[in-house]
Amino acid sequence: MKKSVDFIGVGTGPFNLSIAALSHQIEELDCLFFDEHPHFSWHPGMLVPDCHMQTVFLKDLVSAVAPTNPYSFVNYLVKHKKFYRFLTSRLRTVSREEFSDYLRWAAEDMNNLYFSHTVENIDFDKKRRLFLVQTSQGEYFARNICLGTGKQPYLPPCVKHMTQSCFHASEMNLRRPDLSGKRITVVGGGQSGADLFLNALRGEWGEAAEINWVSRRNNFNALDEAAFADEYFTPEYISGFSGLEEDIRHQLLDEQKMTSDGITADSLLTIYRELYHRFEVLRKPRNIRLLPSRSVTTLESSGPGWKLLMEHHLDQGRESLESDVVIFATGYRSALPQILPSLMPLITMHDKNTFKVRDDFTLEWSGPKENNIFVVNASMQTHGIAEPQLSLMAWRSARILNRVMGRDLFDLSMPPALIQWRSGT
């Protein structure tokens, strides 16, 4: 007999993990979360040394809406007997290793996460008025589902396939290549690119013969962490943003890009000091090249390595670069889950690759109103620059659970706005 529950989450990344953590406060809610991996892991390939979060630790799984929930980061510190040393360390942000360990600790304590359960298909049973979730370990019925399968690593069109010497940054710590004596090129001017460049500079994977850092941006730009920029990452801002016309939303997202895609000031200063010490104090050979304003247009195999053809955006110059190892820190892109062919005829799309998402993170679809398809990390175009970030995940999770339960279990009422983002407010 197939088990029937109130809610099934597909994927156990931080966003669905946040929903799972908050759901433990709701005794009458029966929910399950499935993941294809054998255990919890969060971007294991990017857990490189001296790599820090861009958000403060209080923006954890639960604290923004339920600070007494046992899955808070503060409780993690207490349970691991490091609360006082953490405070004494005066860390502005925590390392990715520690935040990953916090997420793993929370996941291992929950009894409604099922690993090695690959979701293969989701259909809707019209007779039962329930979603049918087919997994590698059996079938389940659910009144609501939440898609949290994440985004896919993005590689430029010039990259035809990945190899041992040409790959995405998300695999760096899994591959741990020996870069000793090799010419290295890091492509991508965001935080991941900065983290890889700094570690390569320090010889984390061996002393490289040459290191190049290529970015499309016109400089290695800092993350915009100004106080008023942080207001973009509040529920008040999202409520105003979502009601704007589509072209205005696109314009704002372009303007706000450096609030999420820039490099922390600490990272930039650390890199600059490393370069100063290497070249001005130790007087080492200048085997480092910083190459902004360039796009890699062609990637060709060249002997045991690679030849990169680049185009300069400002002076239209063309350059070539020989490299033994090329690492693309080029981010992630949305991809439609491959488990929805049965449901797709019922779902309203914004375009062929983008769902039409309502304010409450449900998809528009032609099924019964009491059955909801929720999505997380799939609606930046409608919900703002904060959507793919951790900053508002607890608030979003609470909003989803309030909708599932049909009442406000979590108080999400907003204080008077500091900034009047819309006219008439």
Curated annotation (Swiss-Prot):
Its EC number is 1.14.13.59. It catalyses: L-lysine + NADPH + O2 = N(6)-hydroxy-L-lysine + NADP(+) + H2O. FAD binds at I8, G9, V10, G11, T12, G13, P14. GO terms for molecular function: L-lysine 6-monooxygenase (NADPH) activity. GO terms for cellular component: cytoplasm; plasma membrane. It comes from the Bacteria. Its main location: cytoplasm. It is found in: Cytoplasm; Cell membrane. GO terms for biological process: aerobactin biosynthetic process. InterPro entries: FAD/NAD-bd_sf, Lys/Orn_oxygenase. It is an enzyme of class 1 (oxidoreductase). It holds the Pfam family Lys_Orn_oxgnase. Its cofactor is FAD. Keywords: Cell membrane, Cytoplasm, FAD, Flavoprotein, Membrane, NADP, Oxidoreductase, Plasmid. Flavoprotein monooxygenase required for N-hydroxylation of lysine. Involved in the biosynthesis of the siderophore aerobactin which is a chelator that mediates the high-affinity iron transport systems induced by the organism under iron-stressed conditions. Belongs to the lysine N(6)-hydroxylase/L-ornithine N(5)-oxygenase family. PANTHER family: L-ORNITHINE N(5)-MONOOXYGENASE (PTHR42802:SF1), MONOOXYGENASE (PTHR42802). This is L-lysine N6-monooxygenase. It comes from Escherichia coli. The lineage of its organism: Bacteria, Pseudomonadati, Pseudomonadota, Gammaproteobacteria, Enterobacterales.
